[in-house]
Design a protein with these regions (language model features):
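Bacterial N-terminal signal peptides that target proteins for export
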Residues: 2-11
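Intrinsically disordered, low-complexity segments
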Residues: 7, 20, 226-227, 512
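Secretory pathway export signals and precursors
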Residues: 15, 73-76, 120, 234, ...
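Periplasmic c-type cytochrome electron-transfer domains
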Residues: 23-413, 433-436
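Cellulosome-associated attachment modules in secreted, modular CAZymes
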Residues: 410-559
Length: 559
């Protein structure tokens, strides 16, 4: 890295103490983005409690005695939405039906179109009917920031549709208008935005649908049970719990309410750096932004929570359905035909494996998965031009594009992308402190969180907050000089063994082996137990012996 002789201001101990005890995850001008799976910033105390209660419900399995089944795909939401909790998953479900001269028939009378692959007993099991001529795999979608997505006005989504491709750009996305389950039949249709076919418009509808269809739990919005392969006699024999099975708890919330709270209050995943990457220009240049619309603003309605109302979000989706050519799976849902899919959001993309609705871009590196996913947008359908343009990119342009897409879901300061801000990342921060200028395309941009072109003391305050949030102890001060060890290392102290303690640290009271602020019987016991080893070596000869005992006794008393 380039080095500068004018280094940023050294972080003071007072500033560290201030940011270390911050409850808002902000300090010195740096406000951390929530991690994927965290609650929204700005929730009230009551809303935060609803989020955590909902998260618990989301992860808690149902049993047959509480209504599970008789046929289902999983016993709890987290089993599918697991990366992180509420996010993408690697669990697949199966859709089936008949292709009748180009028209999809869902075989509802035989349990279609969703196969429930599990059952509470062998005798209640559901199978793909022999009549089915269409069988399709669907991967688990993400529930990240559902409340923010739900709050995008219908009119804003509709403003982007161009079903007849009037502008001739090859993109003819359209709104999938649907009726929420909680609305009356005479209510106006809403712009669908959830599900692979945008077949769901509200979070409550999504919760009710998944609760019944994926877990077999009937509820107030879908009070009838799924019969195994449509066999009502088998249903009567297998299902002993009265419907609806989801009833309000002691606080008046049904299960579908609880998981709706959780999904609505999930935060927008991070994007690091937040803007300015050349790869986003490449993304736009090859036409990806025609469908993957970066930015939206949620409605400014008085009925919305403060944490949701009037917020700018960057999901990278238009929430329209598009003809996806060879990616078509032959399944129709609602008004979305066999070739159409909703543009998936891209936030938290870097953690997604597999990619695509059928999981066909899986394994390998992130870059390999992305390359496969983009290539599969062609050679036919609305994504074909972008797929062709991607194939013509230079190696440098591809790298820039991959770096940008990899920023979607990257945590700030997490240089090694292991989902933990720790001493390994601290070493990189210390190196980045010496850089003359940091751009959004530099590796050091992950530490330049306020994007002022320097990794300095302000960014270090944010680093300490991020490390503390991840459960790392940032309070160590080996020489008791008032400057935390992490700050000393950031400012240039060596830490070759990466333990978060400066290698040249001289403890203010080396004979205080127990660290209780005094040299006493406890330290003597430690030394005697370490006799003959290096564990209590005070004179630096590599062994604990008489000379070390003399040093300890000479220092007896308070440090």
């Amino acid at each position: 890295m380039a080095k500068t002789t004018t280094l940023p201001t050294i972080l003071t101990a007072a500033a560290v103490a201030l940011c270390a005890h911050s409850a808002t995850l902000a300090g010195g001008g740096v406000t951390l983005q929530p991690k994927a799976g965290d609650p929204l910033v700005g929730l009230s105390k009551q809303q935060t409690a609803l989020f955590w209660a909902g998260r618990l419900a989301y992860a808690t399995p149902f049993g047959p005695e509480t209504g599970l089944g008789p046929v289902m795909n999983k016993s709890n939401c987290q089993s599918c939405h697991s990366n992180p909790v509420g996010g993408w998953g690697s669990i697949a479900v199966t859709r089936f039906g008949i292709d009748d001269k180009g028209e999809f028939l869902p075989l509802e009378e035989l349990g279609g179109s969703l196969l429930q692959a599990l059952s509470i007993s062998v005798g209640c099991r559901e199978e793909i009917p022999v009549e089915a001529t269409v069988v399709a795999t669907r991967m688990t979608n993400s529930s990240m920031a559902f409340g923010l997505i739900e709050a995008i006005p219908d009119a804003a989504i509709a403003a982007n549709e161009d079903p007849l491709d009037a502008d001739g750009d090859g993109i003819s996305g359209r709104v999938h208008w649907v009726l929420p389950l909680e609305d009356s039949p005479t209510s106006p249709l809403r712009a669908g935005r959830f599900g692979w076919k945008a077949q769901v418009a509200t979070v409550l509808s999504f919760s009710a649908d998944a609760t019944r269809n994926e877990m077999g739990i009937t509820n107030s919005l879908i009070p009838t049970e799924t019969a195994p392969n449509g066999d009502m006699a088998l249903l009567a024999a297998c299902d002993a719990v009265a419907d609806p099975e989801d009833v309000p708890d002691a606080e008046g919330h049904a299960f579908i309410d609880r998981v709706t709270h959780f999904q609505r209050y999930l935060a927008q995943p991070p994007q690091t750096p937040r803007s300015g990457m050349t790869g986003e220009q490449v993304f736009n240049a090859i036409g990806c932004n025609a469908c993957h619309v970066a930015q939206w603003t949620t409605a400014n309605l008085p009925g919305l929570e403060d944490a949701i109302r009037g917020k700018t979000i960057r999901p990278y989706s238009d929430f329209l359905v598009h003809d996806m050519g060879l990616l078509a799976d032959g399944v129709q849902e609602g008004d979305a035909n066999e070739q159409e899919f909703r543009t998936p959001v891209l936030w938290n993309l870097r953690t997604r494996d597999p990619m695509l609705h059928d999981g066909s871009a899986s394994g390998g590196t992130f870059e390999e998965r992305v390359a496969i996913a983009i290539a599969k947008h062609g050679p036919f359908g609305e994504g074909a031009a972008s797929a062709a343009a991607f194939a013509k990119l230079s190696a440098t342009q591809r790298s820039q594009l991959f770096a940008f897409l990899g920023s979607l879901g990257r945590n700030e300061y997490d240089f090694d992308a292991n989902q933990l801000v720790d001493t390994l990342d601290l070493q990189v921060m210390a190196q980045c402190r010496l850089a003359n200028t940091v751009t959004a395309d530099d590796a050091c941009a992950i530490g330049d969180v306020n994007q002022d072109g320097l990794v300095d003391s302000v960014d270090m305050q944010g680093f300490l907050l991020a490390a503390e949030r991840d459960g790392v102890d940032i309070t160590g001060d080996c020489d008791k000089d008032g400057t935390p060890d992490f700050v000393a290392i950031f400012n240039g102290a060596p830490d070759v063994d990466l333990n978060g303690v400066p290698d040249n640290c001289a403890p203010a009271c080396p004979a205080d082996l127990s660290g209780d602020g005094a040299v006493n019987a406890g330290d003597l016991a430690i030394m005697l137990n370490a006799w003959g080893t290096a564990a209590a070596d005070l004179d630096g000869n590599g062994s604990t012996g008489g000379a070390d005992l003399a040093i300890l006794l000479g220092a007896w008393g308070p440090c």
